[in-house]
C-alpha cells in the first residue's frame, strides 16, 4: 500500500516528515511517497542516511501553501503545491491515501477538488480523536465547518459512528450532541433543532453532553459545529499541557513530593503519552471520497508516523465504502431537510 505524504507541510520543515515516513515504511510495511521539492528532499534523505530505503520515494512538488494563506485561492492557483500533488496522487490511483500537516483548510480543499465528496454528503467534517479516561473518543466537526445546520450534524453523527466502529472497534458507539446542558431543551437553536432528528436516526444517540463530560468518555462520538469543536480540541490540548506544568511546579516546591514523583514517574509518562496529540497523529477528513488525514501543524516524527498509521488503518478497514452505504440509506431524510433550508 502506498500513502502520499505532504513532506513540506508543518511548522518544522521536511525532517520530521521524512523521519516519520521512514519509520512507517519500516514498521508498518507500507510505501510512502514524499511530496515536496525534489532537490531538498533528496539532500535531506542523503544527510539522514535514508536515500536507499526501499519503500520511500519522492514526488516533485516545488510549491508550498503557507499556513496563513487563503486555502481555496492557493489550491486553485498553485497546481504544483505539495498538498495538491499529494491529493492528486490519490486521484490518479498512485496512492491509497494522503497525509498533510500543512494548512488544514488547503488540505480539505485539495481533497475535495481532487477526490471529491461521497455522493450524498453535504459537508465533509474533521473527526478528531481525543483521549478520555475510557480510551479514545471522536469529536466532529473539529474545524472544517464553522457554521452548520441540523442535517450537517446528522451526517456527522452517522460518519462518526462508522469511524468509531471501524477504527476504535466499538460495536455500538454512543453518540452525544454537545450542548450547555443535558436536558433536551437546553442549547442554542442548532442544538435544539438537531436533537429530535438524532433521536430518530437509528443510531445509538444518548442525548446532550456537556463540555465537562468530554474527558470522561461519556459517549464515543460527540457531534458539534466546527467552530465549537475546534475550540474544544484546542482547549483540551492546552489543558493537558497546563496540568502537567502545574503538577511539575508544585512537585518542585516540596522535597517529599519530588521523591513521590520519582516513584510515580512511569505513571506520569504513561498519562503524558495518552494525552499527547502526537499519539493520535492526525484527524480524518470524513465525507471525502477517499482517505485524507489532517495533521497538527506542529507534528513531530511520532505524529507523522501515527498519521500514516491511521491512514493505512482506514484504507484497510474499508470505512469509505461503509460511509457511502450508510449515507445512501439516509439519503431521503437528508434531502428533505436540505430542501427546507
From Swiss-Prot:
It catalyses: a fatty acyl-[ACP] + phosphate = an acyl phosphate + holo-[ACP]. GO terms for cellular component: cytoplasm. It is found in: Cytoplasm. InterPro entries: FA_synthesis (IPR003664), Phospholipid_synth_PlsX-like (IPR012281). Pathway: Lipid metabolism; phospholipid metabolism. Its EC number is 2.3.1.274. One of its GO terms (biological process) is fatty acid biosynthetic process. It comes from the Bacteria. Keywords: Cytoplasm, Lipid biosynthesis, Lipid metabolism, Phospholipid biosynthesis, Phospholipid metabolism, Transferase. It is an enzyme of class 2 (transferase). GO terms for molecular function: phosphate:acyl-[acyl carrier protein] acyltransferase activity. Homodimer. Probably interacts with PlsY. HAMAP family: PlsX. Belongs to the PlsX family. Catalyzes the reversible formation of acyl-phosphate (acyl-PO(4)) from acyl-[acyl-carrier-protein] (acyl-ACP). This enzyme utilizes acyl-ACP as fatty acyl donor, but not acyl-CoA. This is Phosphate acyltransferase. It comes from Elusimicrobium minutum (strain Pei191).
